[in-house]
Structure formats: structure tokens, C-alpha cells
């Protein structure tokens, strides 16, 4: 860019670029008197090509805008990696959902059985949450992928430069225009960590559910040995270590976000050395999130689902209660009155230790006295209502109804394809820009 704007000569740009290419092949000493990597590279370049040419490399730039650029480019790359890993995890969830569209399972509120549902419905719920994480990262990417370079230390420069051109060469879309804003703020980095903190929270919740469901008390699923560990003293144990570590690492990412906000909230305008303290939090959160997604995807592909235990748990409860109440509503009885009637039947069935379907005529009759409901109708509804029929009856959009599962699985698979195209294009756009820049470098160094 400096050469194109006639700030340096062709001879100088050739010496600088060749010198930098040679430095890429060298190993740097860990101990150096240089303050940071930028100063080290400049000092090494000057030693090799002289200060007349090497001393011009830093023209119209500052470490303040260089560091801001480096952080943005690193986050940009991490977002693309995380988006691909996240999409792969969503694929695993949706594929598992496709295989379990008729696998019956209890749905819980307050950790108490609430309604009968389908395992696919549960899996799609988390797929949808992760899709929103993907959306957040997509939006954040746009704010991250902007060029702060050329802002100088804080107030810009009198030297003729082209910030748009620099950004284009690096695959950045537009510039962070205000030079104070470009060098001072790190809100795009905070936004990124906030997005992956929410993402990790969703992974933690999946881990919690799977951890509970893998216990002998539930035995809804079994983790493969790859994602479990034995006890050192108890031979029967199979501990869900990976799920527990995912929960634990989520706390680290949330801590990283809190640390960054705590650092930034007290800073004045302009660059302060405090900003260096947030960088380890960014790198740590990225690394944890990528690892957690890779593990989650693999775990979902290998988990063994115990359909029989899931269905038995659903049959042993009173999960058709709401469905019975709604059938009374279909027959002209108010929902509140229906709720009271079925509630009484559940209570007597629970006391008797049997399902509602096994209540006899006299037991039902005693509980509906004065309720203005036909005994014959109620008995007919009880006999015809099962957990399976309930799932066929549910047709509201987004419900656990069997027909809705087929529609939602198909829709989510299509959504995955759209996102995959977008992620690939975004990565290709960056790589194409860098390739063009490298061609320019080669042409100038011939």
C-alpha cells in the first residue's frame, strides 16, 4: 500500500518484502530486548536490509493500530473455525434426531415428568439453540472483520495512505473509521467472547442432561468408552468425564468474559497497557470452545440410545394427563374444569399405584360427581388415550407431534446446507484476498 501510494520506492518495497520473506524462515530467540513481536521484526529487518529501507516499514502505522488489526484477524479466523465446528455439531444433533423421530421419552420441567415427547424433539431444541449461536457469530463476524490499520497511535497520519486498499488486501470489509475508536475499543472482541460464552452455556446444558440420563437411575443413554473413564477403586463405574469437563470449562469462558469486561470498563479513551490483559482471555476462550465442539460432535455420533428405558419411563408416569384434559376441552368442557377432573383422577391413580387407564368405573364416577361430564365419555377417552396416540394428536407448530418432527428435521437439514454455503464463501473470500496479496508480493520481489 505504501508503494502504491508512492510513499516508498519500488526498490525499497522489494528489499522490505524480501527481507520479511527471509525472516519467516528463521527461528527467533525467545529472549529479546524488544518490547513485542512487532518491534522485534522491525529491528531484525533493519539489521538485515539497513535502516534506510527497513526503517520505512513502520511508516504511517503504530503498534496501537497493528495490535488492534492482529486481534481482529485472529478472532476472524477463530470465528470461521468455530462456525464450522458448531455447524458440524448441529449436523450431529439433527442426524440423531432424524434417527429418533419416533423414540418416545418423557419431557421434564423442574426435573419432574411433564409431558410425553419424542427424543428428536429434545435434540432439535438444542440444535435450534445452537443455530442462534451461529447467528450471533455471523453478526459478530461482520463487526470484527473491519480494518483499524491506518488509524496510527490515535489521531491518524499526515502521510498519504489508503486504508480501504489495505483492508481489501487482508480480506477485511470496510474500515473502523474513527481513529480513536479503531485503537481504543475492544467491544467487538467482547461481543465475540459473549457469543461463545452463550454457546458454551448451551453445550454445558446438553452435557448436564446427558450426564443425568447416563446414570443407572435413568439409563436413557450410554456414552462410548472413548468419552468415559473408570473409577480407580469401583469396577462398576463409568464416569462421564468429558461431559463434566465441558461444564467446568464453560465456567472458564464465562470467567474470561467477566475478566475482559472488568478490564475495559475502567479505561479512559486512547490505548492503555491494560488492554494487553484481555488477549489471553480471548485465546483461552477460543481454544476451549473449539475443543468442546469437537468433543461434543464426536460424542453425539457415538452415543447409544436406550429406547426401551425411555419409553418405559414415559409409560410409568401420568404423562397423558394434559392430553386427556385437552380431549375434554374438545368435547365442550372448559380447560380449568377439565384440569380439575383429570387432576382428581391422577391423584386417585397415584394413591392406588396404578395408571389412569386401569382405574375402574366406580373410581372414576366418584371423582366426577357434580362436574357435569359424561362418565361414558370420560371412560372412552381414557381407554383410547395412550402416549403414542397423544403424539399423533399433537399438531401445533413446533410440538412433539410425530408429523412435526418430520417437518422440523427436513427444515433443519436445509438450514444446515444454507449455513454451510455461507461459511465456505466467507472463508474463501478471506483466502482469495490473501492469495491476491501474495501474488502482488511475488511480483514485487522478482
Please place each PLM-identified region on the residue numbering.
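A helix-coil-helix interface module used to build multimeric assemblies
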Residues: 1-156, 161-163, 167, 227-230, ...
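Short, well-ordered beta-strand elements within core beta-sheets of diverse protein domains
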Residues: 1-7, 74, 121, 190-198, ...
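Helix N-cap/coil-helix junction residues
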Residues: 7-8, 172, 333, 354
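A short structural micro-motif
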Residues: 18-26, 186, 344-349
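Leucine-rich amphipathic alpha-helices with coiled-coil/heptad-repeat character
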Residues: 27, 93, 97-100, 104, ...
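Short runs of predominantly hydrophobic/aromatic residues within well-ordered alpha helices
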Residues: 38, 42, 189-192, 321, ...
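Glycine-rich cofactor/substrate-binding loops
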Residues: 53, 234-446
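Charged, flexible cofactor/metal-binding loops and thiol motifs
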Residues: 71-72, 79, 83, 87, ...
Amino acid at each position: 500500500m505504501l508503494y502504491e501510494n508512492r510513499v516508498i520506492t519500488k526498490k525499497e518495497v522489494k528489499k522490505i518484502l524480501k527481507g520479511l520473506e527471509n525472516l519467516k524462515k528463521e527461528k527467533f530467540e525467545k529472549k529479546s530486548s524488544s518490547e513485542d513481536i512487532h518491534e522485534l521484526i522491525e529491528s531484525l529487518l533493519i539489521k538485515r536490509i539497513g535502516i534506510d529501507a527497513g526503517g520505512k516499514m513502520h511508516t504511517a502505522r503504530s503498534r496501537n493500530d497493528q495490535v488492534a488489526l492482529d486481534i481482529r484477524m485472529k478472532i476472524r479466523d477463530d470465528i470461521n473455525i468455530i462456525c464450522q465446528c458448531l455447524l458440524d455439531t448441529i449436523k450431529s444433533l439433527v442426524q440423531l434426531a432424524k434417527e429418533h423421530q419416533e423414540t418416545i421419552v418423557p419431557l421434564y420441567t423442574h426435573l419432574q415428568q411433564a409431558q410425553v415427547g419424542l427424543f428428536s424433539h429434545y435434540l432439535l431444541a438444542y440444535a435450534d439453540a445452537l443455530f442462534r449461536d451461529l447467528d450471533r457469530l455471523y453478526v459478530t463476524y461482520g463487526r470484527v472483520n473491519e480494518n483499524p490499520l491506518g488509524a496510527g497511535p490515535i489521531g491518524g497520519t499526515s502521510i498519504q495512505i489508503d486504508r480501504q486498499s489495505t483492508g481489501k488486501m487482508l480480506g477485511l470489509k470496510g474500515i473502523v473509521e474513527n481513529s480513536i475508536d479503531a485503537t481504543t475499543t475492544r467491544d467487538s472482541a467482547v461481543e465475540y467472547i459473549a457469543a461463545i460464552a452463550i454457546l458454551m452455556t448451551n453445550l454445558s446444558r446438553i452435557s448436564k442432561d446427558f450426564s443425568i440420563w447416563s446414570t443407572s437411575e435413568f439409563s436413557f443413554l450410554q456414552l462410548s468408552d472413548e468419552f468415559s473413564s473408570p473409577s480407580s477403586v469401583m469396577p462398576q463405574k463409568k464416569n462421564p468425564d468429558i461431559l463434566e469437563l465441558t461444564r467446568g470449562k464453560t465456567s472458564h469462558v464465562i470467567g474470561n468474559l467477566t475478566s475482559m469486561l472488568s478490564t475495559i470498563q475502567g479505561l479512559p479513551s486512547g490505548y492503555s497497557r491494560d488492554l494487553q490483559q484481555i488477549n489471553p482471555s480471548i485465546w483461552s476462550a477460543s481454544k476451549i470452545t473449539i475443543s468442546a465442539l469437537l468433543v461434543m460432535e464426536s460424542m453425539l455420533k457415538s452415543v447409544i440410545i436406550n429406547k426401551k428405558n425411555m419409553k418405559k419411563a414415559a409409560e410409568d408416569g401420568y404423562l397423558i394427563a394434559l392430553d386427556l384434559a385437552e380431549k375434554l376441552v374438545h368435547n365442550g368442557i372448559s380447560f380449568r374444569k377439565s384440569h380439575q377432573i383429570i387432576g382428581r383422577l391422577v391423584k386417585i391413580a397415584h394413591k392406588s399405584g396404578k395408571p389412569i387407564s386401569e382405574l375402574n368405573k366406580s373410581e372414576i364416577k366418584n371423582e366426577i360427581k357434580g362436574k357435569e361430564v359424561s362418565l361414558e365419555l370420560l371412560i372412552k377417552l381414557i381407554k383410547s388415550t395412550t402416549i403414542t396416540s397423544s403424539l399423533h394428536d399433537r399438531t401445533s407448530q413446533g410440538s412433539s407431534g410425530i408429523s412435526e418432527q418430520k417437518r422440523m428435521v427436513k427444515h433443519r437439514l436445509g438450514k444446515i446446507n444454507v449455513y454451510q454455503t455461507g461459511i465456505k464463501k466467507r472463508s474463501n473470500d478471506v483466502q482469495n484476498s490473501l492469495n491476491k496479496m501474495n501474488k502482488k508480493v511475488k511480483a514485487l520481489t522478482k
